[in-house]
Amino acid sequence: ADGFISCVAALCAIRICPAVKDYVITSHKSKEPATMIILEALDIPVFLDCDMCLGEGTGAVTIYPILDMALAVYGGMCTFSDNQMENYVPLV
């Protein structure tokens, strides 16, 4: 969901078919005053808070490269054993 209007549409879709929630990505928190009400109702984490306004359409364009990078790191990062290192152990 990219901003207020698409978050409202996502909430409507979820109310019709709750399974839809598993497929909704909320890209950013819009500056629209009602956005927080909708986001609280959706109960889905928001990735960005960049003061973007209604209708810009930049949230989705911004979030997908970030998701691609995160997946690349997750899928391609070496493990401790790959690097012949001991596993991390918290000090406390």
Label each PLM-derived region with a short phrase:
Residues G3-V92:
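A generic structural signal for tightly packed, nonpolar segments enriched in small/aliphatic residues
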